[in-house]
């Protein structure tokens, strides 16, 4: 560890994890639940396994949410009441940050002094709360943005809504105040430095991972039978929230010409996910698009699945398609590759790291449906190439594990704690010197 002190001296005993707008216990693929939920839950499991207590603060969204949930050994989820349980969109939550911050502060005040050693906030809403808690508790704040409004606004999908200026300002404030900033890839580090003027020496690049015990290669025949997919069908799968940003419509538009021109390939499109966001947010809209394109018979819609079920979907697929307009990483891509399924993805953000172009799949620059059709045509016509990419996918995915992610988090935490300790000692020395002179 490139830190001056021993690991024990800079390893937190207990951390407060802030996730205002979505609970790590929620099902990914529905509403606002997605990769961030998976990230928080999996890293919490890894940290708890190393003896670090993790308390996750999230907003209660149901009257049945218990105030405290002992979610796993060493992991406690605190459901904070902040605004009505239902009827609030993520865009409404800035008005509830005061209530949420009050709940966090009151929970900490009921514990002994020095209860938390560090705060790790996720997404800018949580960063605002973490900023206040950091100053109140006198502990370091480590922040992970997961997405940046300015990046998203540069690449809006048709029908999507631009992120408001208030969010951009909020992200700037958190970027200025956090002790350390964690990003998913070197691409995101460059974006954060350029857009928010953050010195690179305050940024730590930590790759997310995949649960390599769950997402493994295997026989997808059982999943195909369950989904009503024939053994000889070529399955192109989209997994994620149904929103313009994720671009599931691009898969339909790109595959439609192939379905019409090559009925012998028996191409099946599988869409796994639920509604979220603005614009093209309901499966009904995609169903209507499939009908318009004349491929309704070849498209299957499935609700989100838990990890074990999702692994079966990946194994049942010949290709997983990730056509997002922006991604800070792309967990779906890594999970699919870990199951031995090649990925066709947009060459944006962290997907250029998550997918090894020509080795574990293909990266496509841009969102022109014709270019996507050409790549899908090549891959659906060449079983040998798909087999080669499948082998490369499994190997590439081994680079990404949650254990390695936890190693990176602990390194960032250590830097933050040590810097805070040194700053405190400097202040004390100055005060002592001032006292002597007095």
UniProtKB/Swiss-Prot annotation:
UDP-N-acetyl-alpha-D-glucosamine binds at residues 27-28, 35, 241, 246, 305, 327, 335. It comes from the Bacteria. 1D-myo-inositol 3-phosphate binds at residues 21, 32-37, 90, 123, 147, 167. GO terms for biological process: mycothiol biosynthetic process. Mg(2+) binds at residues 314-315, 317, 341. Keywords: Glycosyltransferase, Magnesium, Metal-binding, Transferase. It catalyses: 1D-myo-inositol 3-phosphate + UDP-N-acetyl-alpha-D-glucosamine = 1D-myo-inositol 2-acetamido-2-deoxy-alpha-D-glucopyranoside 3-phosphate + UDP + H(+). It is an enzyme of class 2 (transferase). Its EC number is 2.4.1.250. One of its GO terms (molecular function) is acetylglucosaminyltransferase activity. Pfam families: Glyco_trans_4_4, Glycos_transf_1. InterPro entries: Glyco_trans_1, Glyco_trans_4-like_N, Mycothiol_biosynthesis_MshA. Gene3D superfamilies: Glycogen Phosphorylase B. Homodimer. Belongs to the glycosyltransferase group 1 family. MshA subfamily. Catalyzes the transfer of a N-acetyl-glucosamine moiety to 1D-myo-inositol 3-phosphate to produce 1D-myo-inositol 2-acetamido-2-deoxy-glucopyranoside 3-phosphate in the mycothiol biosynthesis pathway. NCBIfam families: mycothiol_MshA. This is D-inositol 3-phosphate glycosyltransferase. It comes from Tsukamurella paurometabola (strain ATCC 8368 / DSM 20162 / CCUG 35730 / CIP 100753 / JCM 10117 / KCTC 9821 / NBRC 16120 / NCIMB 702349 / NCTC 13040) (Corynebacterium paurometabolum). The lineage of its organism: Bacteria, Bacillati, Actinomycetota, Actinomycetes, Mycobacteriales.
